[in-house]
From Swiss-Prot:
Name under which the protein is recorded: 60S ribosome subunit biogenesis protein NIP7
Subcellular location(s) per record: Cytoplasm; Nucleus, Nucleolus
One GO CC annotation: nucleus
CDD domains: Nip7_N_euk, PUA_Nip7-like
Other facts: Present with 5170 molecules/cell in log phase SD medium.
Main function: Required for proper 27S pre-rRNA processing and 60S ribosome subunit assembly.
Signal peptide stretch: none
Family the entry assigns: Belongs to the NIP7 family.
Keywords annotated in UniProt: Cytoplasm, Nucleus, Ribosome biogenesis, RNA-binding
Primary localisation category: cytoplasm
Length: 181
């Protein structure tokens, strides 16, 4: 497990900024419980600093996981967020969409968010911005990218796509064989 290089840090922060914006400072500058970003087998982990120091005594081949897995780097060098990062993203989300109970199951089965399923949404969502999808009782269900801005979404047909799904908590069951390998 090693620290991220300057280039890797830039790529990770750009991806995170798409979902949490300037709130990324809360991840980095937490005085009460400082956290660090670590890389292990192309996966980026968000780890409390004191735990990362303890992990230095474990050999790399023996270390499976540590902290919260935010995502992984692809072979082409791009960073892809993982569903396990949802707890971090939801806490500091900039743009949010709440879906009605009748839209939860279709979303958890891997479908996009439709206009008919939207209960409420943030007022200032631009087009193609990262959004966090919540149930009406504020339980985070996943994240994606907005298909239209908030003002355009209000005038859509009920079958129109409001947000493209990128990850949802249903992946824990659908991809349980390959999720942590």
């Amino acid at each position: 497990m090693r620290q991220l290089t300057e280039e890797e840090t830039k790529v990770v922060f750009e991806k995170l900024a798409g979902y949490i914006g300037r709130n990324i400072s809360f991840l980095v500058d937490n005085k009460e419980l400082p956290h660090v970003f670590r890389l292990q087998k192309d996966r980026v982990y968000y780890v409390p600093d004191h735990v990362a120091k303890l992990a230095t005594s474990v050999a790399r081949p023996n270390l499976m996981s540590l902290g919260i897995c935010l995502g992984k780097f692809t072979k082409t060098g791009k960073f892809r967020l993982h569903i396990t990062s949802l707890t971090v993203l939801a806490k500091h989300a900039k743009y949010k969409i709440w879906i009605k109970p009748n839209g939860e199951m279709p979303f958890l089965y891997g479908n996009h968010v439709l206009k008919a399923h939207v209960g409420k949404m943030s007022d200032d969502i631009p087009e193609h911005a990262g959004v966090i999808v919540f149930a009406m009782n504020d339980v985070p269900l996943g994240f994606g990218v907005s298909a239209k801005s908030t003002s355009e979404s209000r005038n859509m047909q009920p079958t129109g796509i409001v947000a493209f799904r990128q990850a949802d908590i249903g992946e824990y069951l659908r991809d349980e064989d390959t999720l942590f390998t």
